[in-house]
């Protein structure tokens, strides 16, 4: 019996040590879920994720701006069935699929985390939830949804014709001037008083030079003849008288 007791004592100690270090008891960080005192939804989304389309077995980078007074950030990813999926890299605490990261310092900063999507083809959409928690465990929730490849609808705008409907009536444009300028109808009155036409012809108003020269020649010729006749007449009278 003494030998049996001496053998059972070490076995009991090993059993206790195994129970203490079993996976169920050594994962206190995964079972220590700290509840939120209150959860409110943020009005504006400040999340950026890359890539922005869901793919299986892909590493994503999630970043968000953390304001002053936030001490930790809790992240979770859920599929279309609201089941927690994927795994977060190097969290400070982990509980029920949530990953909590404790922040160093109490100031505004840009928070980043890595998330690995599961290797599954049954997932169509993934919703990333981000809880920013203050010292009183009051959390603000912000979310972003990743659609599956091929589910994003793109609106194509026709390049032929784009019809816009203005909210107010546009003012009518001024009429364009016609290409043919309108002729003015103002007629200048022609004076009725006409200049009298000269009645005398050029021949009448301007005597020929030949006539003038002929009369001058006759005068020059008749003057000495007349004087000679007068002298001769006086001589004859003188001879008759004396």
Swiss-Prot record:
Biased amino acid composition, Low complexity: 179-205
Residue ranges, Cytoplasmic side: 242
Chain segments carrying region Disordered: 162-209
Cell compartments where the protein resides: Membrane; Apical cell membrane
Keyword Transmembrane helix listed: yes
Extracellular topological segments: 27-220
One of the GO BP terms on file: cell differentiation
GO cellular component, one term: apical plasma membrane
Entry keywords, A to Z: Cell membrane, Differentiation, Glycoprotein, Membrane, Signal, Transmembrane, Transmembrane helix
TM stretches of this protein: 221-241
PTM annotation, UniProt: N-glycosylated.
Signal peptide, first to last residue: 1-26
Sections of the chain in a coiled coil: none
UniProt-annotated glycosylation sites, renumbered to this chain: 28, 81, 106
Record's bilayer topology term: Single-pass type I membrane protein
Main location class: membrane
InterPro entries for this protein: PLET1
Purpose: Modulates leading keratinocyte migration and cellular adhesion to matrix proteins during a wound-healing response and promotes wound repair. May play a role during trichilemmal differentiation of the hair follicle.
Name of the featured protein: Placenta-expressed transcript 1 protein
Protein's organism: Bos taurus
Upper lineage: Eukaryota, Metazoa, Chordata, Craniata, Vertebrata
């Amino acid at each position: 019996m003494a030998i049996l007791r001496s053998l059972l004592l070490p076995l009991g100690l090993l059993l206790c040590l195994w129970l203490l270090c079993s996976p169920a008891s050594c994962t206190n960080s995964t079972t220590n879920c700290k509840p939120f005192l209150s959860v409110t939804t943020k009005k504006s989304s400040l999340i950026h994720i890359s890539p922005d389309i869901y793919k299986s077995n892909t590493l994503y980078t999630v970043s968000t701006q953390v304001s002053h007074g936030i001490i930790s950030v809790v992240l979770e990813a859920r599929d279309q069935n609201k089941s927690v999926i994927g795994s977060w890299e190097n969290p400070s605490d982990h509980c029920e699929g949530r990953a909590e990261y404790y922040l160093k310092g109490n100031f505004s900063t840009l928070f980043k985390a890595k998330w690995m999507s599961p290797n599954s083809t049954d997932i169509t959409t993934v919703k990333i939830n981000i809880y920013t928690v203050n010292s009183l465990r009051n959390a603000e929730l912000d979310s972003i949804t990743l659609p599956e490849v091929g589910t994003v609808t793109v609106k194509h705008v026709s390049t032929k014709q784009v019809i816009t409907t203005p909210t107010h009536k546009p003012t009518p444009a001024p009429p364009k001037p016609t290409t043919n300028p309108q002729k003015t109808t103002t007629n200048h009155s022609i004076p009725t008083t006409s200049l009298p036409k000269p009645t005398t012809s050029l021949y009448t108003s301007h005597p020929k030079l030949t006539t003038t020269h002929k009369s001058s020649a006759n005068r020059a010729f008749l003057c000495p003849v007349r004087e000679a006749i007068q002298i001769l007449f006086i001589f004859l009278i003188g001879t008759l008288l004396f």
